[in-house]
Amino acid sequence: MLVGGRGDDAEYARIERLTAASDVPVTLAGRLESDELVRAYRSSDVFVLPSFYEGLPLVTIEALACGCKVVATDLPGVRPWMEAMLPGAPVTWVAPPRMTDVDTPEAADLPLFERALADAIAQALAAPPSTFEPSAVSWEACLGRILKVVDLLEGGSYG
C-alpha cells in the first residue's frame, strides 16, 4: 500500500505509528512531485480518498485519468457532479460517518466507516478492469463540459 500526502506533524506521527503496527506493508511517500504522482497513480489499481470534507476532489479526477479505480467518501455535491460529468467512471462510494462539525467525524461511527472503506476497496480490487476511457477526464474534456454547462446556464448554445 502506498500512502501519499502529508497532514500536520501530529497527524503524520499517528499515521507512522499505525503503519508500523499494520500487517499490511505500507510505504509513506509523503508529498510527491507531479511526475512521481503520475507514476504512482499508473502503478496502482485503486485510489482511495476517505475524506470528510471536499469541494471538487481533483485528486480523484487525476487518479481516474491515470487508469485507477476509485473509492471515495460520498460527500454532498461530489457524487452528483462526478456522475454527471464523468458517467461510467469506476468509482465506489462509501457513506460518510456522522459529523460533529464540518470536518470532524463522530468517533463512534469510525469503525463502521473504516469497515465500509475496507469492503469497498476489496470490491474495487476484485472488479474486472474498467472500460472507462481516461481521456474523458483530460483537462480539455473536463473544461469543455464545464464551459458547456456555464454557457447553457447563461442561455447560450455552446458547442
Regions found by a protein language model. Give the residues of each.
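Glycosyltransferase donor-sugar binding loop
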Residues: 1-13, 28-31
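Short alpha-helical donor nucleotide-sugar binding micro-motif in glycosyltransferases
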Residues: 31, 39-44
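A short alpha->beta transition loop at the rim of the catalytic pocket in nucleotide-sugar-dependent
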Residues: 45, 67
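Aromatic "clamp/platform" in nucleotide-sugar-dependent glycosyltransferases that forms part
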Residues: 52
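Short glycine/serine-rich donor-binding loops of glycosyltransferases
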Residues: 57-60
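Short hydrophobic beta-strand element within catalytic cores of glycosyltransferases
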Residues: 69-72, 77-79, 83
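A charged, aromatic-enriched C-terminal amphipathic alpha-helix characteristic of glycosyltransferases
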Residues: 105-119, 125-154
